Curated annotation (Swiss-Prot):
Record protein name field: tRNA dimethylallyltransferase
Family note: Belongs to the IPP transferase family.
Binding site for ATP: 14-21
Site (Interaction with substrate tRNA): 105, 127
Subunit structure: Monomer.
Top enzyme category: transferase
Residues holding substrate: 16-21
Source species taxonomy: Bacteria, Pseudomonadati, Pseudomonadota, Alphaproteobacteria, Hyphomicrobiales
């Protein structure tokens, strides 16, 4: 543990649509704390609705940081998020207050508690080489290359995950070592693992599935089409993370008149449910036993299980 690691933090993890944001606001009001985004998609601008960022009403109830601060034309890494959190925690006006980290990105929580893996920088020449090959040959072809050169990490990556495939190849060529080996070398933590309150929401699967369907229908009604239209107007590289947000492809197909409204909503709901399942599986398998599991945010406050860390 780093000597300057925050000792009064609250961490709230869980799948999308599980009620994390409402719980974070309630805790912020109870503790006088502030909320820090711990979700890799909610950092991007433009997609307020599709990434389920806090509403204007939510923002009025508690201070929120690191939401929508990254242009969708950028690629934002776990390392950059770590740097932004470190700078945020160092701000004088926030000293002594409770930081409440809330989101669904497991790697962000891992970075907070275990420190960020010390992966190396790669040269521009190596980066340009592999990104050029990715553009020319595609993700599946480079995944096949990775299967030969580094089968262990290739097995852990989806053949369509172009960003991580390129990163693995870059690191291997630059250092002669697998990215998996570099990931074992940990840096410092920003949050003290022992004193942090660690909460993971694990709602009933049927309840979550229904909530996801209702929420996406509401997103559509509230302006998700306009968000995607604005995103497409930027003429961005389809490989950028913001372009891969759930709902972007489906709404784009609707706008192009190649998919009906009903099918676009149905496919988006299915994709969101699948994503929630992957998140739940990751949290179940990767988080330590000291994370307290609750079915809902309301349950956290029942029976006196919540304690003010101040």
């Amino acid at each position: 543990m780093s000597e300057d690691a925050v000792k009064n933090a609250i961490l709230i993890a869980g799948p999308t649509a599980s009620g994390k944001s409402a719980l974070a606001i309630r805790m912020a009001k109870a503790t006088g704390g502030f909320i820090v985004n711990t979700d890799s998609m909610q950092v991007y601008g433009v997609l307020d609705l599709l990434t389920a960022r806090p509403s204007r009403a939510d923002l009025a109830e508690a201070e929120h940081f690191l939401y929508g601060h990254v242009p969708p034309s950028s690629t934002y890494s776990t390392g950059k998020w770590f740097e932004d959190v470190e700078a945020l925690l160092g701000r004088c006006e926030l000293q002594g207050r409770v930081p409440i980290f809330v989101g669904g990105t497991g790697l962000y929580f891992r970075a907070l508690l275990g420190g960020l893996s010390q992966t190396p920088e790669v040269s521009a020449q190596v980066r340009d080489h592999w990104r050029g090959r990715m553009e020319a040959e595609g993700a599946k072809a480079l995944h096949a290359v990775l299967c030969v050169r580094d089968p262990a990490i290739a097995a852990a990556l989806q053949p369509s995950d172009s960003q991580r495939i390129v990163r693995a190849l870059e690191v291997l060529e630059s250092t002669g070592k697998s990215l998996l080996e570099w990931q074992k070398v940990k840096g410092r933590a920003l949050v003290d693992d022992q004193s942090a309150q660690k909460i993971v929401l694990r709602p009933d699967r049927a309840w979550l599935g229904e909530r996801i369907a209702r929420r996406f229908s509401a997103m559509w009604a509230e302006g998700a089409i306009d968000e995607v239209r604005a995103l497409l107007a930027l003429d961005l590289d389809p490989a950028l993370p913001a372009m891969k947000a759930i709902g972007v492809r489906e709404v784009s197909a609707f706008l192009a008149e190649t998919m009906s409204r009903e099918e676009a909503i149905e496919r988006s709901v299915i994709a969101t449910r699948q994503y929630a399942k992957r998140q739940s599986t990751w949290f179940r398998n990767q988080l330590g036993e000291d994370w307290r599991v609750y079915a809902s945010g309301e349950e956290v406050f029942q029976g006196g299980s919540f304690r003010d860390p101040q």
